[in-house]
Amino acid sequence: MERNFVIFCAIVIFLLGSFSSLVVGEEYDVVYGYECQQSKCLRIEITEKTIETAISLPVCRLLCGDSPVGTVWPKPTGIMRTENILLHVDITTITFQFPTKLTKQLSLWEASKERFLQQLKSHTEDVIVAPKPGGSNLTVVVEINSEIDELPRLTLDTDESYNLTISPLKGGGAAIAKISANSYFGGRHGLETISQLIVYDDIRREYQLLAKVEIEDAPKYKWRGILLDTSRHFYSVKSIKRTLDALAMVKLNTFHWHITDSQSFPLEIKSHPELHRFGAYSPSKVYTHDKISEIVQYGLIRGIRVVLLFENNPRVGENLPLANPNLLIASIREYSQCHANI
């Protein structure tokens, strides 16, 4: 009850500065808002009476619940300290400071920055009324505690932990977010967490940042991922990238790619082009070297290792004898007949 009361007081203080911009009943106004009651977000109708306590659902999810930070996923494994201080931020003026001494990682950080900003912009892609201009400045500082200048490589020994602090500057007109990590992967996870602490308030049409945060986080498991079988069901490069985006959002780090099997062989092997020529579902459903490299790089930027699973040539489908009978131990027809006789 005490925590809910503190949340309620913080919300009321935040709302007092925003009432002048709201006119209930205008076209395209949000009809419903939310209140935090017993650690749950309950919907209420926005009226002249409730406008002072109503908050948007994203803001309610940020502040309400048993966890100190409701929108961060997965839940941090270490310290989580927050104060319910919301700051209207201008996402067009966010600045970044990356470790410039690690020159081989700069392109990865630049790509991570662009993805971070695109994630924030996606909150308002479908809104009818554009967000209000203005807001406070946010500076994101990333510190990597390593002097080794090399392209990051994710192994079972990689330290993916990070510490994150967000603090408002004096005067309340800006905030600074500091990430400290021992590897690119930990720093990237910290950047992902910051993106989860910025929500779009569709009632006040502003981006809001939880501006007083301290988080220490590290994954419980070294191998966290999914398996996708594209030998039985072909997925386009675009679809695979969309899957990698989803993995990155929840800090999973492994894409186990089952790329070939008896159903199809969509993998380009330059020394044996007949494999994908006769083994793929169609000429357009082939993963070339360039496409695979593109997916591997796309995953690296997002802190994901791409692990390819290759089935041996004998498990390629029945069209392989047309390509090169010498590469086949037993055809699928003979294999099926053998099992039928057993």
Features from the language model and the residues they span:
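Acidic, contiguous N-terminal accessory segments
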Residues: E2-K222
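Feature activates predominantly on carbohydrate-active enzymes
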Residues: L156-T158, N163-I342
